């Protein structure tokens, strides 16, 4: 009975800030952590287990110590996950395995696109032109601009 009383006495925090991201405190830990860019469900579960937190617990009801443990595990991501789980293996510039999260995801994506454009690779040229990059057909789909109507022969002859 005492555990239920202590659980109900813990106040729910609706927003929990981890890794410069506001996370929903009403969700389970493993689902709430997916709100951080670069963290999927599998990695979120790994973070929770490494921090000693129940992945199915509600994030907003966790005590401050467990949230700090989660923050520490996320900050030291290179030490806590194997290289095959990282989203940026053998980085183009540095050659180091790393995991990119948060605002870094957009920055590195933009840098990669700029490198492709500067080297004039096929993908870079397609990105510059705003066309499909991954081999999709473009004959009839992916058109942009105003639609051009077809004029009938009778009206065309009068003009």
UniProtKB/Swiss-Prot annotation:
Residues 136-159 are annotated as: Disordered. One of its GO terms (cellular component) is small ribosomal subunit. GO terms for molecular function: rRNA binding; structural constituent of ribosome. Keywords: Ribonucleoprotein, Ribosomal protein, RNA-binding, rRNA-binding. Residues 138-149 have a biased composition (Low complexity). InterPro entries: Rbsml_uS13_C, Ribosomal_uS13, Ribosomal_uS13-like_H2TH, Ribosomal_uS13_archaeal, Ribosomal_uS13_CS. One of its GO terms (biological process) is translation. Belongs to the universal ribosomal protein uS13 family. Part of the 30S ribosomal subunit. Forms a loose heterodimer with protein S19. Forms two bridges to the 50S subunit in the 70S ribosome. HAMAP family: Ribosomal_uS13. NCBIfam families: PRK04053.1, uS13_arch. Located at the top of the head of the 30S subunit, it contacts several helices of the 16S rRNA. In the 70S ribosome it contacts the 23S rRNA (bridge B1a) and protein L5 of the 50S subunit (bridge B1b), connecting the 2 subunits; these bridges are implicated in subunit movement. This is Small ribosomal subunit protein uS13. It comes from Methanothrix thermoacetophila (strain DSM 6194 / JCM 14653 / NBRC 101360 / PT) (Methanosaeta thermophila).
């Amino acid at each position: 009975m005492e555990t239920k009383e202590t659980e109900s006495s813990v106040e729910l925090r609706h927003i929990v800030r981890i890794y410069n991201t506001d996370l929903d405190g009403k969700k389970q830990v493993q689902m709430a952590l997916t709100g951080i860019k670069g963290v999927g469900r599998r990695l979120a579960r790994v973070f929770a287990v490494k921090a000693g937190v129940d992945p199915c617990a509600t994030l907003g009801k966790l005590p401050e110590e467990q949230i700090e443990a989660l923050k520490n595990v996320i900050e030291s991501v290179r030490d806590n996950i194997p290289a095959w789980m990282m989203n940026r293996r053998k980085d183009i510039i540095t050659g180091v395995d790393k995991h990119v999260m948060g605002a870094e995801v957009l920055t590195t994506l933009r840098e990669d696109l700029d490198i492709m454009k500067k080297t004039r690779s096929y993908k870079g040229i397609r990105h510059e032109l705003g066309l499909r990059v991954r081999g999709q057909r473009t004959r009839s789909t992916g058109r942009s601009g105003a639609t051009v109507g077809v004029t009938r022969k009778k009206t065309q002859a009068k003009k």
